[in-house]
Amino acid sequence: MGANNGKQSGSEGKGSSSISSDLSSSTDQTSTKAPKNAATSEDSDLSMRTVSTPSPALILPPRSSSAVLNGSSTSSSTFGTETIAMVHMPPTSLTHPQRCLRQPRDQQGAPVDILPDHAFLQIFTHLPTNQLCRCARVCRRWYNLAWDPRLWRTIRLTGDVLHVDRALRVLTRRLCQDTPNVCLTVETVMVSGCRRLTDRGLYTVAQSCPELRRLEVAGCYNVSNEAVFEVVSRCPNLEHLDVSGCSKVTCISLTRDVSVKLSPLHGQQISIRFLDMTDCFALEDEGLHTIAAHCTQLTHLYLRRCVRLTDEGLRFLVIYCPGVRELSVSDCRFISDFGLREIAKLEGRLRYLSIAHCSRITDVGVRYVAKYCSRLRYLNARGCEGLTDHGIEHLAKSCLKLKSLDIGKCPLVSDAGLEQLALNSFNLKRLSLKSCESITGRGLQVVAANCFDLQLLNVQDCDVSLEALRFVKRHCKRCIIEHTNPAFF
């Protein structure tokens, strides 16, 4: 994947006449010792993949040298250590002068040639990238089929050294040949971990992929609000956005202004339902206010380690996004019981809540959630040191459909709280009590005797006897026990 109109670029290392020959050499031949900090041939096989629709091109690691055959460049000049995408011309007698493409008169075509195009496409959807590259070298028909846009609903690029901006530009340009300037079939772009991605790469996606529904740029710390604005403005069908680890992203809106007061909506909304802003450290209450006002259809929101958020930001969220089903504010140190009181206004719609390591939360806030969010299925309260047996009792009696509970590192939770949990939460499947200093084997036995469907129990760093662990194993036969007792196995 990489050049356009016959112009192709390569990288340092061996030159080759086609992308598939590079790939073949990486899988069929013994690789030589690579220089320090250089990507290996194995990396080239893994550096670009599609989730379910592999492509006949590859994001190649650094190589060198170039070759020109009859005026058509098949590799390019050196670009230092950067990795680029290559898109090669279909095999012809010009690009392969040593190979006779004309079959002998007495040789008939292979039986596979009688298959119709739609059968080939169905087969190609199941091939990995390197095999599809080899298929693209067979003949012009196979090359054209391998680049059929229907095989490109998903674009996935990985690699720290990948020149992802150029790869996206070349890919979208190649896929736009049948529909000038737009790739109508591309619905998913996944470039998480490509640290060299910049706003320029997202501009390319925004301009070329108007039907985009899912975008993942986790860990791409060079992405800013400007690029996100371009994507949400030009891709009206976007539903899933992952910008976790993008520390420069502080707002998602249809205007370039962070303040909601300076950005009138005029009836326009963003259709995002899933938003992950984990580790967006610069996000503040004002930014969350703007996000909530523009993304009113949110159902899944993850704000882990957004350390500047307070209870006020949660108030805005509940006002504009009443349909939130999953919410995580783990490690948000300024969130308190007042914030949980606002979250409780989501009532029966809330299914998943993570408040791990929110040290200001106590039984009071948990009581609000237990009273109004009776359909809660998952609660992570690990490290909430203010939580006691009273909070667990309210939770157990009100949230009867609770399936997963993490109360590890809650030193005030004891066997009394576990007894209330066991007598009410019969649907419990996952329970973590890691580092709960007040838990003993008596509480575990009560849980095991009542929660028969328990599938995972974490009692690491707990003062639990060997007999109690064996009791759990006898009564909960499908339960996986995570423990630190060397005598139990």
UniProtKB/Swiss-Prot annotation:
SUPFAM superfamilies: F-box domain (SSF81383), RNI-like (SSF52047)
Chain positions of LRR repeats: 168-193, 194-219, 220-245, 251-279, 280-305, 306-331, 332-357, 358-383, 384-409, 410-435, 436-461
Low complexity: compositionally biased ranges: 1-31, 64-76
Locations listed in the record: Cytoplasm, Cytoskeleton, Microtubule organizing center, Centrosome
The entry's keywords: Cytoplasm, Cytoskeleton, Leucine-rich repeat, Repeat, Ubl conjugation pathway
Pathway connected to this protein: Protein modification; protein ubiquitination
Top-rank taxon: Eukaryota
Ribonucleoprotein among keywords: no
Gene Ontology cellular-component terms listed: centrosome; cytoplasm; SCF ubiquitin ligase complex
GO biological process: protein ubiquitination; SCF-dependent proteasomal ubiquitin-dependent protein catabolic process
UniProt feature, compositional bias: Polar residues: 32-55
InterPro entries: F-box-like_dom_sf, F-box_dom, Leu-rich_rpt, Leu-rich_rpt_Cys-con_subtyp, LRR_dom_sf
Residue ranges, annotated region (Disordered): 1-76
The F-box domain, residue ranges: 109-155
UniProt keyword Cytoplasm present: yes
One Pfam family this sequence matches: LRR_6
Protein family per UniProt: Belongs to the FBXL7 family.
Subunit structure, as described in the record: Part of the SCF (SKP1-CUL1-F-box) E3 ubiquitin-protein ligase complex SCF(FBXL7).
Purpose of the protein: Substrate recognition component of a SCF (SKP1-CUL1-F-box protein) E3 ubiquitin-protein ligase complex which mediates the ubiquitination and subsequent proteasomal degradation of target proteins.
Protein name: F-box/LRR-repeat protein 7
Protein species of origin: Danio rerio
The organism's taxonomic lineage, starting at the top: Eukaryota, Metazoa, Chordata, Craniata, Vertebrata
Name of the gene this protein is made from: fbxl7
